Amino acid sequence: MNKKKKINRTKVDTVRSVNNNIRSSVRKLNPILKAIVGKKVDVAIRELQFSAKRITREIRKTVSSAVANAENNNQYDIDKLIVKEAYCGKKVVMKRFRPRAKGRAAPILKPYSTITIILSEAKQMESHGSKS
């Protein structure tokens, strides 16, 4: 009867921000989140700002919150921050019903999701001499 230990995904050199209960499905969030992983924070925010998707506003707010956490809590340099991880998970699904013909009802599913953004500082590659 051992309790499962909670695994902390963040390391010491990372900063995270979580946005719970976003009114969108995981299927719609995943392509947007995969597009910003590995990019600098300012580039990721700019791409989200000019995207035509409705949900990018919520993702942009989460990335901005992670940047604020990095600046205030850990004193990281904003210009060196990159998006290390960005993933989403399922939350609750609200179930509603729409009346249809002949007394029937059709289900309407309204899924909710959670977004986690993890930032880290980009490591500078130092070159020691030339490669020959």
Swiss-Prot record:
The keyword Secreted does not apply. GO terms for biological process: translation. InterPro entries: Ribosomal_uL22, Ribosomal_uL22_bac/chlpt-type, Ribosomal_uL22_bac/org-type, Ribosomal_uL22_sf. GO terms for cellular component: cytosolic large ribosomal subunit. Keywords: Ribonucleoprotein, Ribosomal protein, RNA-binding, rRNA-binding. Coiled coil: none annotated. The keyword Acetylation does not apply. GO terms for molecular function: rRNA binding; structural constituent of ribosome. It comes from the Bacteria. It holds the Pfam family Ribosomal_L22. PANTHER family: CHLOROPLAST 50S RIBOSOMAL PROTEIN L22-RELATED, LARGE RIBOSOMAL SUBUNIT PROTEIN UL22M. This protein binds specifically to 23S rRNA; its binding is stimulated by other ribosomal proteins, e.g. L4, L17, and L20. It is important during the early stages of 50S assembly. It makes multiple contacts with different domains of the 23S rRNA in the assembled 50S subunit and ribosome. Part of the 50S ribosomal subunit. Belongs to the universal ribosomal protein uL22 family. HAMAP family: Ribosomal_uL22_B. This is Large ribosomal subunit protein uL22. It comes from Pelagibacter ubique (strain HTCC1062).
